[in-house]
Amino acid sequence: MPYMLVRHRVKKYATWKRAFDEDAEARKAAGCLGGQLFRNHDDPEDVMVLLAWDSADKARAFSRSTPVRDVMDAAGVIGVPSIVFLGDTERVEV
């Protein structure tokens, strides 16, 4: 399964989270299957988003789209996000 890992700083987490939640239907329509949010323990404005996609090509296209960039800007994303595309390799136990 393809994943997209996004890491960025935000001005205010609550503002960013509201914008992220409001964009859920756009993500779903683009092929996103859901995911998980993470915050840095030492810096709660450092946010990581791991999203599963039905195709890597759709994830890449979504990440490059103007509407996504506009949402990020309005949500208070600081600077250029780090975006990495991942493939599911192996699940490991303790």
Enumerate the language-model features and the residues they cover.
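Residue-level detection of beta-strand scaffold positions
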Residues: W16, A24-E25, V49-L51, F85
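Short amphipathic alpha-helical segments
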Residues: K12-G34, P67-V71
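Residues that cap or initiate secondary-structure elements
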Residues: K12-A14, S55-D57, T89
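Short, well-ordered beta-strand segments in beta-rich or mixed alpha/beta enzyme
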Residues: P2-R9, Q36-S65
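Glycine-rich beta-strand-turn "strand-cap" elements at beta-sheet edges
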Residues: A30-D46, D70-V94
